[in-house]
């Protein structure tokens, strides 16, 4: 069964009022495979948690995290973020339902995180990403722009990443406006439409540029064989 779990999300402040005994944390999803969790990323999340004016909980949904790998990963994350929720690899519908319990997501860096971004925005979650100098760090920002998410959510440094996440965590109205924007748009159509023929055109141009060099190289090789 590959049907998507529908998004059902009550406004945060409404849920917060119902839970009066203790502050309701803003749940922040981290969707990524195991290899993308690294010390710089965890330290940045810890700084966000330290600075936040509201309770926040990072919820890790880790692809391929099972058995001893999950135990090791949970220990490593809890060493930096003691209150984090660390989940094992789960079936897709359970994963989507879990994302529905969150308010936003953060993309790990410095690697691109296309699958995690797609999973989160399909469930109506806005997020924050870090665009760096490497080619592999640009894809998240490209997806954000395609979805018309605010440029402020595409950070270019650690401090900007922290500030953008704090704003999304603390400003409930802004965050929920972005949630509705994503839910009201055809996210899958936006993400997967494109012009694949442009890639073929570029490859064709490169090939055409190399043809004269290949021909010249062939002539030189033929001449050398004849002279020998």
Kindly label every feature range from the protein language model:
Residues 93-95, 115-116:
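Short acidic active-site motifs
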């Amino acid at each position: 069964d590959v049907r998507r779990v529908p998004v059902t999300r009550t406004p945060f402040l409404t849920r917060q009022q119902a839970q009066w005994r203790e502050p309701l944390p803003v749940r922040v999803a981290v969707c990524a495979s195991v290899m993308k969790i690294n010390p710089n990323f965890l330290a940045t999340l810890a700084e966000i948690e330290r600075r936040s004016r509201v309770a926040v909980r990072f919820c890790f949904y880790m692809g391929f995290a099972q058995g001893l790998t999950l135990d090791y990963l949970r220990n490593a994350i809890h060493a930096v973020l003691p209150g984090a929720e660390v989940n094992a690899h789960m079936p897709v519908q359970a994963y989507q339902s879990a994302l529905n319990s969150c308010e936003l997501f953060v993309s790990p860096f410095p690697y691109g995180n296309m699958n995690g971004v797609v999973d989160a925005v399909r469930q109506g979650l806005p997020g924050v990403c870090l665009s760096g100098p490497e080619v592999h760090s640009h894809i998240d920002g490209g997806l954000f722009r395609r979805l018309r998410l605010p440029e402020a959510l595409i950070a270019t440094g650690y401090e900007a990443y922290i500030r953008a996440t704090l704003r999304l965590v603390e400003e409930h109205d802004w965050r929920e406006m972005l949630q509705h924007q994503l839910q009201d748009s055809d996210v899958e159509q936006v993400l997967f439409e494109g012009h694949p023929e442009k890639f073929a055109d570029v490859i064709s141009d490169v090939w055409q540029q190399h043809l004269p060099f290949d021909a010249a190289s062939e002539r030189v090789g033929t001449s050398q064989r004849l002279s020998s």
